[in-house]
């Protein structure tokens, strides 16, 4: 589809996008426009999810695909608001496997993604989900179904998105584009207050981490660092040393590292 003008996409009323990160088991199979698309969507303020197109023909290969996917998307972790989808389709090597093996490949990929701290889901056609996979072993996972009809042919509780057309047109994108409808659970509620990610605790305001400021909650002061992460231990802030509780990141008590003697003022600054 070439370069995407994400500002035009946003102006066209698009509320979310799922961007291809890559395919297969090797890092050189990263989508060449992945970083460009992620940056453009971020600048335009469009929430994004990820999909990884699979060629895996065994659980081990699916695990390898998940590992590569995780590596590729990690730098964009804070931007990824929607699930990371495993895209399993009608590749000959996949069709040649049993239903049990195909289902296990889905589970292995999604479990690996979830273990890395991302939300995980499955993308496939309605026919694939109903006839090529064991749905009873996938009911716990969100599913995004492609079914080009007036109404989605699947209405299970785990349905979070329906792709209803492959021939849509959106200003800012050249040629045909897939069109989707999102349901409850696709977009997370906007975060306000404390939230935890793989690196630590963050304070969110309107879904964005606050950076380089003090925040007071429940009677305690917390310092948020340059990446928004709550700071702990001995820290220098604006030229002054602070002793922040190693467990809570708070100022207000005296934390003395083992073997040290530290005196602080009433604000927690080291004297």
Region roles according to the model:
Residues 1-8, 136-191:
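Functionally critical loop-and-helix segments that line ligand-binding/catalytic clefts
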Residues 1-110, 114-116:
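Substrate-binding cleft of extracellular glycoside hydrolase catalytic domains
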Residues 23, 52-54, 90, 126, ...:
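A mature extracytoplasmic/lumenal domain signature
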Residues 48, 119-121, 143:
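Hydrophobic anchor at the start of a short beta-strand
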Residues 61-64, 128-136:
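Glycine-rich, charge-decorated loop segments at or immediately adjacent to ligand/cofactor-binding or catalytic sites
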Residues 70-86, 90-92, 133-158:
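Structural recognition of alpha->loop->beta junctions
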Residues 113-131:
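Aromatic-lined carbohydrate-recognition surfaces of secreted/lumenal glycan-active proteins
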Residues 189-271:
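Extracellular adhesion/carbohydrate-binding repeat motifs centered on closely spaced tryptophans
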């Amino acid at each position: 589809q070439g370069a995407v003008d994400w500002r035009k996409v946003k102006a066209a009323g698009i509320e979310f996008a799922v961007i291809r990160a890559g395919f297969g088991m090797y890092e050189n199979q990263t989508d060449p426009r992945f970083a460009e698309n992620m940056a453009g969507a971020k600048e335009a303020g469009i929430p994004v999810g990820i999909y990884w197109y699979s060629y895996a023909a065994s659980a081990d290969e699916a695990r390898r695909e998940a590992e590569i996917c995780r590596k590729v998307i990690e730098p964009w972790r804070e931007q990824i608001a929607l699930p990371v989808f495993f895209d399993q389709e009608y590749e000959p090597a996949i069709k040649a496997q049993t239903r049990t093996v195909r289902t296990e490949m889905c589970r292995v990929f999604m479990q690996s993604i979830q273990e890395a701290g991302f939300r995980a889901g499955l993308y496939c056609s309605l026919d694939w989900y109903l006839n090529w996979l064991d749905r009873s072993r996938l009911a716990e996972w969100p599913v995004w179904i492609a079914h080009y009809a007036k109404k989605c042919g699947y209405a299970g509780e785990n349905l979070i998105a329906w792709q209803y057309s492959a021939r849509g047109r959106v200003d800012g994108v050249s040629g045909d584009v897939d069109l989707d409808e999102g349901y409850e659970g696709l977009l997370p509620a906007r975060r306000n207050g404390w939230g935890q990610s793989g690196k630590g605790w963050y304070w969110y305001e309107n879904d964005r981490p606050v950076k380089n400021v003090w925040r007071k909650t429940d009677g305690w002061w917390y310092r948020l660092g340059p990446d928004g992460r709550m700071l702990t231990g001995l820290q220098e802030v604006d030229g002054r040393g602070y002793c922040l509780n190693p467990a809570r990141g708070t100022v207000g008590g005296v934390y003395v590292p083992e073997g040290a003697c530290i005196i602080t003022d009433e604000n927690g600054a080291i004297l």
